[in-house]
Amino acid sequence: MTDAPEPRTIRFALTELAEQVDAFWQRFPGARAGDDGAAFEAEGATLWLPLAAPRARASEPVGDYAERLEARDEVQVVLLLQAGAMAFGCWRGAELMQHKAVRKYVVRGNGKSQATHLKTRGKSRYGSRLRLQNWKSLLRETNERLADCEAQFGPFDQIFHAVPVRVWPELFAVEPAPVFGRDDERLRRLPLHVHRPDHAELLRVRRQLLAGRIGWSR
């Protein structure tokens, strides 16, 4: 009885996507994308696309995907937003075109944001107005900076975000409204654990988005 071969994995960067997809196509011409478009699967091998890569269509043949890959650089945004902290970056291809990280005083002594406290416990006293004003100011600034970024560099191709579910409606409740709709097909929730937003965390998340990999067992 022979042992099963050890699975092997190689990693590649987004800049190598076209080369890696083409090579995978040549070796596994029958490979197709899964239902979520995140990877191409063949017997004994899988190519996981970088999260920042153009998404494959459900069941799309790898050859079709390879032929429609464009040489142009996409304009992509990463938005990280939590109570009292926001960081965003706008990239064209590998170039960081614009970025900003902001922190404001919106968290109560018990660690709960003022907006959440008002929803669950009612009005608080000292400092509540300041915290709530700061929170709304942060939401407005977030939308303003995204609008300015789109005005300068053109429509976003993909919008990656880590925004708590309870915060999402609040982002749409302030003026100006976001430059995207609630059900915008460009929106992609980050499938990553995100720490408190700042510039270093923004860059860490971006690096995660650029990594793809190929695994095979034969």
Regions found by a protein language model. Give the residues of each.
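Terminal alpha-helical anchor/extension segments at protein ends
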Residues: M1-R218
